[in-house]
Amino acid sequence: CLRDQEIKKISVPHRTYISVPFLASKLGIELRWRDEVWQDYYFIGDTNIIDAAVLWEKNSYIPNTFMCLSFQFRKHLSLGRGGMILTNDEEAALRLKKMSYDGRLPDIPWREQDISSIGYHYYMTPETAQLGLQKLPAAMSTKPKKWTIEDWPDLTIMEIFK
């Protein structure tokens, strides 16, 4: 989403997982820290992009946003790695799909496509997707962990972020 929207600067809470600040560094995005006590999700800066990596609640999608979910091993639907972006913007969904899939459309052999956008090889393998479908009923019937701000360290005191 940050690449798709060509975001130049973001802010994130002091207490969060390290992946968003690392991604900002990787993409050359200016990073600012903010004091925020958040629960379940937070907006990334002044964007409509939401870090919802620990959110697990029925009908929780916020319209006109990009909600980034995580299936990392400590999450409620644990697949080891990977995630999903929820959006109701069909054009953006197609662009993001192409970005995740080497810049190509998934249903046409790549050699037959005139690839017009860069891709990043971030797609979920069919095997991981199948595992997710197998685990989904149990995840839906199990109460999720309620993460709190204390579950996250203050990243600003880590050497890498000084």
Where are the predicted features?
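PLP-dependent aminotransferase-like
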Residues: R3-N59
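Active-site region of PLP-dependent enzymes
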Residues: W56-K58, F66-K162
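Nucleotide-sugar donor-binding and catalytic loop/hinge architecture
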Residues: I62
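Short, conserved active-site loop motifs that form the nucleotide-linked donor/cofactor pocket
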Residues: D46, T65-F66
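Generic hydrophobic alpha-helical segments
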Residues: C1-L2, F71
